[in-house]
Every structure is written in C-alpha cells, then in structure tokens.
Amino acid sequence: MTFQKAIVTEAPHRARLVSDRLIPKLRDDYILVRTVSVALNPTDWKHILRLSPPGCLVGCDYAGIVEEVGRSVKKPFKKGDRVCGFAHGGNAVFSDDGTFAEVITVKGDIQAWIPENLSFQEAATLGVGIKTVGQGLYQSLKLSWPTTPIEHAVPILIYGGSTATGTLAIQLAKLSGYRVITTCSPHHFELMKSLGADLVFDYHEITSADHIRRCTQNKLKLVFDTISIDVSARFCDRAMSTEGGEYSALLDVSIARTNISSRWTLAYTVLGEGFTSEQIVFQPYPTTMSSGRNFGM
C-alpha cells in the first residue's frame, strides 16, 4: 500500500494537504502520471466551497510524466512521455479524479504530449483552457479549424478577452481566419492586440456594445462569452446583429431574443463520463469526447 501527498476536500467546505492519500488505481482508459506542475482554476475553489463532498481529490490542470498506460488507451503514450491536460478535480462520482497530488490518473485519450518548446510550468496552464475553447468555438459555434481558415473574415465577439480562456480563444479564432473583437479593461488593450484582436473595447463603457454593432455593420452573429453572467449576456445581446446569431457561454446563462441561439458548454463533458454538479446529473456525452480528442496540441 503506497501513500502520497495530496490536497483533498473535507467538511466544512474546505481542503487540506494530507500525506496518507493512496496512489489511485489505474482504470483501463486512463494513464498514470507523476505530476511536475499544476495550475489553478476558479473551478477548483468552487468545488471546494460547494460542489464536492469530503474526500475528493482537488485540481484540474497539470503537467507531468507518464508512469503507466491503461490497456484501452488509443493514443500511443508510453512511460516517460511528457504530457499535460486536465482531470475532473473534485468529482463526486470518482473521488480520485484530481490533479493536486504526486501521482494521478487522467483520461488517456484527452491528454496531450508537451511540445519540446514548452516547460512543464507552461504546459500545466493549457488543459482546461484548451478544452473549453475547443468546445466553445469549434463544437458549439462551429468555427472553421485553424488548419482550414475561412477566406473572408467573419466577425466574432470574444467577451472577456483578458481572461485565461479569452486569451486562448482570441489566438485560435484569429488562426481560423475570423475578425476578432474583444472586451477588457483599457490596461489590457495592447495585450489583446498582440494576441490578434482586431478591435478591443472597454466593457465598462455603456456605449461599447452599441459601438461594436456599428463597427460590424450589424453583422455580428457569433459570440463566445468567457464571463457568462447576466451582465455579460446583456452586453452581448446589444452588440449582436438585429438579425440574430449564435451565443455560446461557459455557464448557464442565455439571451432571451428569439432569433439568437443560446447554449453553454462544460469542459468536463469531453471526458465522456457521467457526473453530478449542484444536484444536476450530467449524462455521458460520447460524441463530445470524440470531438474533445481534437482539442489539443
């Protein structure tokens, strides 16, 4: 019996470092990884605060070295490979599915090899973000892939461009050939432009949404909302074309306009496994997992 250090949830709604956590058992479609670096996400503290029962391993993003490969994994990982990706940390259904530990198990075919030009620390920041952006842009909004960019730029609004998800989304949407419009605070304007944003607006300004509609000649029909609260949804509604369009969020918010199709995505669904969140039961989504295999490096 082998123990390790890990961060786990405990009542009342807090987490702590333990030194007696068992090394997780390797499932057939998972890989065993020795972690080198991890990264933090808002979902980590949300799981600790209200989503996870006691005893769940915390953490989603990681980078590390493969120790063992499950027999059903299709990707040709081998022991010693440098890999990165994410897990469903704080998972009430599988309490060992977290990354804040010395040795972890992660769904094999959803993980990625680390490019030689990236350190473990850099690679650890990509897991949740890449899958989330992949879902939001390419599965939900059905953008063209960066490998086959569109020839004539179509406008897309990425609300919340200076967030971790937003910075990734700007770069990928630009590579896909779109005219990228984003929002952030003024001190981030130059960063947004350096990442590829064509137009940047201050979301604090009450006239910004109207300016976006005018700048796009009332043709903005694609929106990816990385903030996903009522205020951001209302902003996006005002910016979008009067003819309607597609609105993709990261939380359960929507635009009431009948000519706008609203939906939201959750990165955990790319794992293809059922789970519960705030008493909501999410069924397995095999097709989402199939698409998720492509949201990597």
Swiss-Prot record:
InterPro entries: ADH-like_C, ADH-like_N, GroES-like_sf, NAD(P)-bd_dom_sf, PKS_ER, Trans-enoyl_RdTase-like
Database matches in Pfam families: ADH_N (PF08240), ADH_zinc_N (PF00107)
Keyword Oxidoreductase: yes
Domain of life from the UniProt record: Eukaryota
Record: residues binding NADP(+): S162, T163, A164, T165, Y203
Gene Ontology MF terms in the entry: oxidoreductase activity, acting on NAD(P)H
Oligomeric form and interacting partners: Monomer.
Note: The genes involved in HC-toxin biosynthesis, called collectively TOX2, are organized into a diffuse cluster that spans >500 kb. All of the known genes are duplicated or triplicated within this region, with some variation in copy number and chromosomal location among different race 1 strains.
Function recorded in the entry: Trans-enoyl reductase; part of the diffuse TOX2 gene cluster that mediates the biosynthesis of the HC-toxin, cyclic tetrapeptide of structure cyclo(D-Pro-L-Ala-D-Ala-L-Aeo), where Aeo stands for 2-amino-9,10-epoxi-8-oxodecanoic acid. HC-toxin is a determinant of specificity and virulence in the interaction between the producing fungus and its host, maize. TOXD does not seem to play a role in HC-toxin biosynthesis.
PANTHER family: HYPOTHETICAL OXIDOREDUCTASE (EUROFUNG) (PTHR45348), ZINC-TYPE ALCOHOL DEHYDROGENASE-LIKE PROTEIN C2E1P3.01 (PTHR45348:SF2)
Protein name: Trans-enoyl reductase TOXD
Phylogenetic classification of the source organism: Eukaryota, Fungi, Dikarya, Ascomycota, Pezizomycotina
